[in-house]
Protein backbone atom coordinates (compact mmCIF):
# COMPACT_ATOMS: atom_id res chain seq x y z
CA UNK A 1 0.00 0.00 0.00
CA UNK A 2 2.82 2.39 0.88
CA UNK A 3 4.59 1.49 -2.35
CA UNK A 4 1.42 2.25 -4.28
CA UNK A 5 1.11 5.67 -2.65
CA UNK A 6 4.72 6.47 -3.47
CA UNK A 7 4.21 5.46 -7.07
CA UNK A 8 1.15 7.66 -7.40
CA UNK A 9 3.05 10.51 -5.80
CA UNK A 10 5.94 10.11 -8.22
CA UNK A 11 3.60 10.11 -11.20
CA UNK A 12 1.89 13.23 -9.87
CA UNK A 13 5.25 14.98 -9.60
CA UNK A 14 5.69 14.63 -13.36
CA UNK A 15 2.26 15.96 -14.21
CA UNK A 16 2.34 19.47 -15.60
CA UNK A 17 -0.82 21.41 -14.77
CA UNK A 18 -1.35 24.92 -16.06
CA UNK A 19 -4.29 27.26 -16.38
CA UNK A 20 -6.13 27.47 -19.65
CA UNK A 21 -5.49 30.16 -22.20
CA UNK A 22 -8.42 32.13 -23.60
CA UNK A 23 -8.68 29.78 -26.56
CA UNK A 24 -8.63 26.68 -24.41
CA UNK A 25 -11.18 28.18 -22.07
CA UNK A 26 -13.57 29.01 -24.89
CA UNK A 27 -13.17 25.43 -26.13
CA UNK A 28 -14.32 24.34 -22.67
CA UNK A 29 -17.22 26.78 -22.81
CA UNK A 30 -18.25 25.19 -26.10
CA UNK A 31 -18.07 21.68 -24.64
CA UNK A 32 -20.00 22.64 -21.52
CA UNK A 33 -22.64 24.59 -23.43
CA UNK A 34 -23.39 21.43 -25.41
CA UNK A 35 -24.38 19.70 -22.19
CA UNK A 36 -26.13 22.86 -20.99
CA UNK A 37 -23.60 23.58 -18.29
CA UNK A 38 -21.16 26.28 -17.35
CA UNK A 39 -17.42 25.84 -17.02
CA UNK A 40 -16.42 25.08 -13.47
CA UNK A 41 -12.75 24.50 -14.11
CA UNK A 42 -10.38 24.51 -17.03
CA UNK A 43 -6.90 23.07 -16.70
CA UNK A 44 -4.20 21.98 -19.09
CA UNK A 45 -2.77 18.69 -17.86
CA UNK A 46 0.30 17.53 -19.77
CA UNK A 47 -0.72 19.61 -22.80
CA UNK A 48 -4.27 18.26 -23.00
CA UNK A 49 -7.19 20.43 -22.01
CA UNK A 50 -9.46 19.11 -19.27
CA UNK A 51 -12.82 20.73 -18.65
CA UNK A 52 -15.08 20.45 -15.67
CA UNK A 53 -18.66 21.50 -16.23
CA UNK A 54 -21.36 22.09 -13.65
Swiss-Prot record:
Keyword Disulfide bond tagged: yes
Secreted as UniProt keyword: yes
Top-level taxon of the source organism: Eukaryota
Location within or outside the cell: Secreted
Protein name: Putative neurotoxin-I
GO MF, one annotated term: toxin activity
Record keywords, A-Z: Disulfide bond, Ion channel impairing toxin, Neurotoxin, Secreted, Toxin
Tissue expression as described in the entry: Expressed by the venom gland.
Disulfide bonds: 20-42, 28-51, 32-53
Entry's Gene Ontology cellular component terms: extracellular region
